[in-house]
Structures are given as C-alpha cells and as structure tokens.
Regions:
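Carbohydrate-binding surface patches
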Residues: 14, 24-26, 528-562
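Glycan-association/targeting regions that enable binding to alpha-glucans and other polysaccharides
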Residues: 1-135
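C-terminal beta-strand-rich structural cap/linker in extracellular carbohydrate-active enzymes
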Residues: 31, 578-596
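Conserved, mostly hydrophobic/aromatic
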Residues: 27, 142, 186, 196, ...
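Hydrophobic faces of well-ordered beta-strands that scaffold small-molecule active sites
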Residues: 138-140, 194-196, 240-242, 343, ...
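Aromatic/acidic polysaccharide-binding cleft in carbohydrate-active enzymes
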Residues: 145, 386-390, 432-455, 459-500
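Active-site-proximal helices and loops of the catalytic beta/alpha 8
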Residues: 230-238, 247-248, 253-264, 331-333, ...
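Substrate-binding/active-site clefts of carbohydrate-active enzymes
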Residues: 139, 143-192, 199-337, 359, ...
Length: 596
C-alpha cells in the first residue's frame, strides 16, 4: 500500500458540511492503489452508534484517486476514521496517522494507540451558503464600452465609429442604455445573469481605473440608467452582477491626487502604499496595479507627460486603513442597496482577507442571496471557505478547455484529470459557484485560438454548459466574434445580423435552454468516463442521467451505452440498440448530450 499518497484533512475541502443535514468526507489515495476504503463515522459522544460505509471513487487525476461519501448528519459532532484495504493488507487511518487494526480498540473514540478525525461541531454560520440561484445561472459577460451605444449623447468627444479596430485609448460609445435596449436579445438567447465589467467613473475605456466609486461613469449614464437596467433585467428574470475594483484605483482618484499634492501632510497618505515622499512617477515610488506595467518606462506610456502619468498609474489601495475601508465598503453598500445581485472582484488575490470578510458581511447583510466572485487565475482554496467569496473566475478550467478543445494539445484522459484536480480543490458549494468561461476581456477569444474553427467552439460550449459551475459566455462569442489578446478581444459587438454565425448562435441557445431546464445539469453528480479519443462526462441526479460525449478529432468515433434507446438532446436524433446496448457514432468534431 502506498501510504505516502494517502491524505485527509478535517475542516477543509476534504471534510465539509454541504448543509446542516449532510456532511461530505473525501480521502486521497494513490491512483489504482487501494481495493477498498471504508469510512467509520458517527457521533463522537455516542461512538458506539458509529456506522461503517463504503466510499466510492469520486474522481481521479494523474496521480491520485479521490474517494468520497456524503454522511446524513443526525448530530453536528462528527468523529471518523478510514479502513484502508489492499489485498490482505489493512490499515486504519485517523488523526494520529496509521495503525494496524489488531492494535487498536476501535470501540473507543480515542485511545493511546489511535485518535480519530474530528469535525468538532457543524455550526450553521460556518456552512458555505451559496446563493439559491447559482445552480441554474447562465451568465453573459459584457464589456459595456463595446456592447451597444444606446444614447449617443453620452459618448465622449471624438468617439470612434462603432466597429473601429480597438486599442487601449479609443472610445466607441457603449453605455448602460445600450445594454437595457438589448435585454430582449439576451433573453431570447437564454441568458439569466449578466456580469458587467466596471461601470464607475474612470478615465479609460475599460474603467478598471476608478476615480469615483460612488458615481456611474458619465459616458455610461447615471444612477437612473443603472436602476432602469436592473429593473428591466429583473422583469425578464435576468440578474445583474457588477465588477468591483478594490485592489487599486485610478491615478485621477481625488484622494490620491491629494497625496500627490500634499505628500505627508495629506490626510489620505495611508490610504495607499507610498514608499517615500514626495510621490514620484519616474521612478515609481508607490505600489500600483502590476507595478511595472503601469510605470512610466512602459512602452505604452513613455510619451506621456507627468500630468498624464498621474492618471495613467493605478495606485494600490491600503485596505487595512480604517478610513479607506469605510469609503470602499460605503460604496459597496450603496450599489448593493440599489438592487444588484452580486459582485465580481478584480485582482482579488492581492487584497487582504480581512477586507473580504467585511465585504461579504456588508453585501450579505443587505442581500443575503447576493453572489460574490473573485478574479483568480490559480488555486483559490483559501478564499473559498464560505467566509469570503462564493466562487472565482475559473481560469484553471478555462486554460484546460482551450488546450483540449481549441488546440488538441492534450488527450481526453488528461483533460478529465485536470478537471478532477480542480474539482477536488474545493467544496461542492464552491464548485457550484465557479464562473466557468472559455474567453474573457483578459484573454484571446476562443475562435481566434482555434484558428476560426467553429466546430471546436461548439464542442467547448457543449462541455461548458454541462460541467459543474456557472457557464459564462463572453459577449459576441455566440455569434462568432474573434480577437487576439487585449485590446483586440474588446471589439465592438457587431449588431448587423447578416454578419452573425447563426448556426453557432442556435447552438448556444439550445445549450442555454438545456442548462436552465435539466436538473441533472444543475445539481447532478459529475463522473468522467472518457475512452479512447472521446471525452465523456456523466451528470446524474437521482434517475436522470445525461451523458456529454465529445469527439474532438477529425475521425468518427463510436460510443456504447447500456440500454436499447438513446436520444441526443442537441440534434434530437434517436438511436436504437439491442441486447441492452446502443452504439452511437459521434461524427468528427461534434458533441452529443445523450439521454437514455
């Protein structure tokens, strides 16, 4: 037995309450190493009533198998250990490590030779409470400046014609009224949640350089325009999530300019990380977003005057400062009270966790069903314990999906291993709350990476809408928009329907409808069954079983299911078999969602 590979940690993603009535336990073991794992679990004060239950493999990655069991809780005080078996070899595994069964009195919760794992008490307030609507959410990300110009009177001076090749300086006039005017399009598409990149006053076209957190950018509209958007969206069953930038502000932020002018005498000097006074822009002597990229020696800023540099740099917030924190959380409370349904948080990794905990209390105190999503590009386990964010932008899965679907750089088996590794990092509530994406304002568009191959995009979308978490479509991907990395991925939405890929859009409509109507896709367990050149994923909720089968090769592939009748929910084709087996031929570069 490979004991070095075995791992468990209570009060973590390996042991967590799903609810007050359900408690999930996971165990990691070497891949293919164990024959059997039994969980011995019960009330730590009534240990004689303990139960022995077999654990099943929830998933496998490249190196490990992950066993799990959902325990129906009858008392919030939980004790447990594992019985591990391989051939004739047996070990007990508990908080004190490994022990031979014959040397332990298992009738005792604790003995000198062996100590059980404990989850001391399931406190309701500690349970990760995701919003009630995340499992059925179908998101659509909008970059407001490039979505629709609904009121040309709001546009900046010298606005570029709609559809101009984008760069980091030009404006095209997108605004909040434009989004409101296109809600019917979004409703028809199947969207029920919007994520808007920043809309607060800023100097750039992307608005991540906020200069006033309490005011809508005047080129986007005003508070009445936001209220109208929220109200009209809610009438259509569409929720609205705003983007909050609390890691840094714009260089033109009034309080930062006060520090530039008055130095150490400024009452706002501790709102930012100033290394020395007076403030200098060349060289930069304060912490800013990304530090180097927005320093004056960056090629994109080398010709700017000092006055321009003052606004181009994005100073980092000191969120430990009580007054700075009060200002930011006051703005958060204002917009949350206005009726938004949650927040996406920019550069979330670099902001202290104390701030995020107060942020969550502020938001949930106003709207207990609000969603909180962080921008993370790597493992975010520490932030997803239910006291900070609900989920994150799932760039780990996004990268894997691009490698498999767009590039064919990994095999189906390796792809499912990466997916399992990502899923096992987090609790079920966190996985359900992940914002899953194929592209965004910070990446090249999928169709560009795939060389314009829409069949690859359709495959990736079929995966996205049937995987665990909240599927999110970047504006225009559904009609075939392309673009390299920023700024090219931020083109204006082309509203000329004759330019759309209508077949692709219809595919997205079908997937969105299925996601919103099929409970197995919302709440079902996930199991990967890839074989050969086929990626296979099962979602099951009670008797409802849906199987996503994707052929990402240029050759037809056969897939066999048990049963004599199978229907593809995408093409609506039926397949008949015999002797309790149905063989389905999956054409090259195509996807099926099969139902028995």
């Amino acid at each position: 037995m490979n004991r070095e590979a075995i791992f468990h940690n209570p009060v973590s993603n390996y042991a967590f309450p799903i609810s007050y009535e359900k408690f999930k336990v996971r165990l990691r073991a070497g891949k293919g190493d164990l024959d059997r794992v039994t969980l011995v679990i019960g009330n730590k004060y009534l240990w004689h009533t303990r139960k022995e239950v077999p654990m099943e493999v929830e998933g496998s990655d490249e190196l490990f198998d992950y066993y799990s069991y959902v325990y129906p809780v009858d008392d919030p005080r939980v004790a447990y250990y594992f019985l591990l078996e391989k051939g004739d070899e047996q070990w007990l595994y508990g908080d004190s490590g490994f022990a031979k069964p014959e040397l332990v009195n298992v009738d005792e919760d604790e003995s000198s030779a062996f100590v059980n794992f404990h989850f001391p008490f399931i406190n309701r307030i500690d349970i990760h409470k995701k919003p009630s609507w995340v499992n059925s959410a179908v998101f659509y990300q909008i970059f407001p400046e490039r979505f629709c110009n609904g009121n040309p009177k709001l546009s900046p001076e010298n606005v570029a014609p709609w559809g101009t090749a984008p760069d980091r300086q030009i404006f095209m006039g997108g605004d909040l009224p434009g989004i409101t005017q296109k809600l019917s399009y979004l409703e028809e598409l199947g969207v029920n949640a919007l994520y808007l990149t920043p809309i607060f006053e800023a100097t750039s076209n992307h608005k991540y350089d906020t200069v006033d957190y309490t005011r809508i950018d005047p080129h986007f509209g005003d508070e009445s325009d936001l209220v109208e958007l929220i109200n009209q969206a809610h009438k259509r069953g569409i929720r609205v999530i705003l983007d909050g930038v609390f890691n840094h502000c714009g260089g033109g932020f009034r309080q930062f300019q006060d520090v530039v002018e008055h130095g150490e005498e400024s009452p706002f000097r501790d709102w930012f990380y100033i290394r020395e006074f007076p403030v200098s822009f060349d060289p930069l002597n304060f912490d800013s977003f990304g530090d180097t990229p927005y320093a004056p020696r960056h090629p994109g800023l080398k010709n700017l005057s000092e006055e321009q540099l003052r606004t181009a740099c994005m100073p980092k917030w000191n969120t430990e400062n009580p007054q700075a924190k009060e200002y930011l959380l006051g703005a958060v409370a204002k917009w949350t009270r206005m009726g938004i349904d949650g927040w996406r948080l920019d550069v979330a990794t670099e902001v202290d966790s104390h701030f995020w905990r107060e942020f969550r209390e502020t938001v949930r105190g106003i709207n207990p069903d609000a969603l909180i999503i962080g921008e993370f590009w790597r493992n975010s386990e520490a932030w997803l314990q239910g006291d900070q964010y609900d989920g994150v932008m799932n760039y780990g899965v996004q990268r894997a999906a691009v490698e498999y679907f767009a590039k064919s750089a990994v095999a189906p088996q390796r792809f499912q291993e990466i997916l399992t590794e990502n899923l096992m990092r987090y609790s079920d509530a966190a996985n359900d709350s992940m914002l899953n994406l194929l592209d965004s304002h910070d990446t090249a568009r999928f169709l560009t990476v795939s060389g314009g191959n829409t069949a690859r995009l359709k495959n990736a979308a079929a995966f996205l809408f049937t995987f665990v978490g909240m599927p999110c479509t970047y504006y225009g991907t559904e009609i075939g928009m392309t673009g390299e990395n920023d700024p090219d991925c931020r083109k204006a939405f082309d509203w000329e329907e004759s330019h759309w890929n209508t077949d692709l859009r219809t595919h997205y409509q079908k997937l969105m409808r299925l996601r919103k109507t099929r409970k197995a896709l919302q709440e079902g367990t996930v199991r990967f069954r890839s074989q050969g050149d086929l990626f296979v994923m099962e979602r099951q909720l009670q008797v409802e079983l849906l199987v996503t089968v994707i052929n990402n090769t240029d050759c037809p592939q056969n897939y066999t299911l048990s049963g004599n009748y199978v229907r593809d929910l995408l093409s609506e084709k039926a397949f008949e078999g015999a002797q309790n087996a149905t063989v389905v031929e999956v054409p090259p570069f195509s996807a099926m969602i099969l139902e028995k």
